[in-house]
Amino acid sequence: KGYNITASHSDSPSFKVKENPEITTDKHYISLNVEKYGGMIMSTWLDRPLSVAGRAVAISRSGIKEYLVNADKDLLVIPNLAIHMNRSVNDNTSLNPQKDMLPLFGDINAKDNFDEYIKSCIQSEDKDKESVADESLTTELFLYNREKGRIWGCNDEYISAPRLDDIQCAYSSLMAYIKALDSISDNYDKVNVCCVFNNEEVGSTTMQGADSTFLSDVLERISIAYGLDREKYMMAIASSYMVSADNAHAVHPNHTDKADLTNRPYMNEGIVIKFNGNQKYTTDSVSYAIFKDICDKRNVPYQTYANRSDIAGGSTLGNISLSLIHISEPTRRS
């Protein structure tokens, strides 16, 4: 009779490796040509151990084969310029993504070029794979920060880690989905759905993004498997509820003026429910009431968030997805 859905996203801001990526500088250094993926603070990528991961496709006479690739080592660094050569570095220095953000891969004495190195990664992950050394390769590879997450603070009350936006919510949603399997009663008439989209950071307009028919197609196929016709599927959609699970901004200790005057969430004070008059988030009075009631009944603390009226803020995937699958305000009948 309906779906209970959590929607999160798997991607984070990064740098995508371009085709033909190798750049030789001064006949000595080999850097990689990359482009920005998503919105980021570029300076946070400097002087950190980085690597690449993603998908590679090998083309051979026997066909096309896909591989997941992770160069599991400290492979790259985007080097900063020393203060002695850039005295204004602390005075709002801007970074050019085509000039300043090229990761250093090695020098001209490197054993493998980048393409050969990726092929060796494919081979090392599974010794039983057919050799791809002589095959043509196409790739979708992204840089990632190799540093591990850390719990810190006087009372270990904070966590810092790469890609919390939005792996944190994707993981929590998946764990909740699995845990709920043990508590579903016989008269439960909903289908629980954990949906993790891709490409939220670049607008969601891809076949695996929120601005696609991916979710609605899957939900309709589930309804067909239950023997429902189109009308009953639409009725099920109208009786569904979706939580868009993404991160929120806490009040910044050094920039408290950047937060809204009355909606000011703090770290470790509970789940954040986000509002936006320009419809960048999914919350309205009905969905808020439902979620608030759930939290109150389970003694789950929650807070509210809104942007300052003179700061645009970000957006997320929920409003995009809801506009396509037409989940209405379902539990008026609850």
What are these regions (language model features)?
Residues 1, 69-160:
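Soluble metallo-hydrolase cores and metallopeptidase-like ectodomains found primarily
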Residues 2-88:
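A generic, well-ordered mixed alpha/beta core segment in the N-terminal half of proteins
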Residues 5, 187-199, 234-237, 241-243, ...:
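Beta-strand segments within the central parallel beta-sheet cores of soluble alpha/beta enzyme folds
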Residues 8-10, 30-32, 37, 160-203, ...:
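Alpha-helical metal-binding/catalytic segments enriched in His/Glu/Asp
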Residues 10-13, 21, 38-40, 60, ...:
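Acidic, glycine-rich active-site loops and adjacent beta-strand->loop/helix elements
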Residues 86-115, 203-298:
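Metal-dependent peptidase/peptidase-like ectodomains
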Residues 285-292, 309-324:
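Short glycine-rich, acidic/polar surface loops and turns
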Residues 325-329:
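Conserved small/polar residues in nucleotide/adenosyl-binding loops
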